[in-house]
């Protein structure tokens, strides 16, 4: 597994100021999801990591739903930057 393969999309000065912003939280969850996904490709039966991945996916999904309700422009920009799919609506 390569640790430093993820390039930061948020500039360093913005990271220091906005660690609580929805965009930063979604960005950090996305990095964790990518790391866990690459880990699970090697270790398919690691059920605790699978559970952690599902929990992080749920948190990211809730944050993205919140952001899409509050500010659709920022939501679309973030989805494009992180290259993640828009969730299906029920």
Curated annotation (Swiss-Prot):
The keyword Ribonucleoprotein applies. One of its GO terms (cellular component) is ribosome. Coiled coil: none annotated. GO terms for molecular function: structural constituent of ribosome. Its main location: plastid. InterPro entries: Ribosomal_uS15, Ribosomal_uS15_bac-type, uS15_NS1_RNA-bd_sf. Keywords: Chloroplast, Plastid, Ribonucleoprotein, Ribosomal protein. The keyword Plastid applies. It is found in: Plastid, Chloroplast. GO terms for biological process: translation. It comes from the Eukaryota. NCBIfam families: S15_bact. Belongs to the universal ribosomal protein uS15 family. Part of the 30S ribosomal subunit. This is Small ribosomal subunit protein uS15c. It comes from Acorus calamus (Sweet flag). The gene is rps15.
């Amino acid at each position: 597994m390569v640790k430093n393969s993820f390039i930061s999309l948020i500039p360093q000065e913005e990271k220091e100021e906005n660690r609580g912003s929805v965009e930063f939280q979604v960005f950090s969850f996305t990095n964790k999801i990518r790391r866990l996904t690459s880990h699970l490709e090697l270790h398919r039966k690691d059920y605790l990591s699978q559970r952690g991945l599902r929990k992080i996916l749920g948190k990211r999904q809730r944050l993205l739903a919140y952001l899409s309700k509050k500010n659709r422009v920022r939501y679309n920009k973030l989805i494009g930057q992180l290259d993640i799919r828009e969730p299906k609506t029920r």
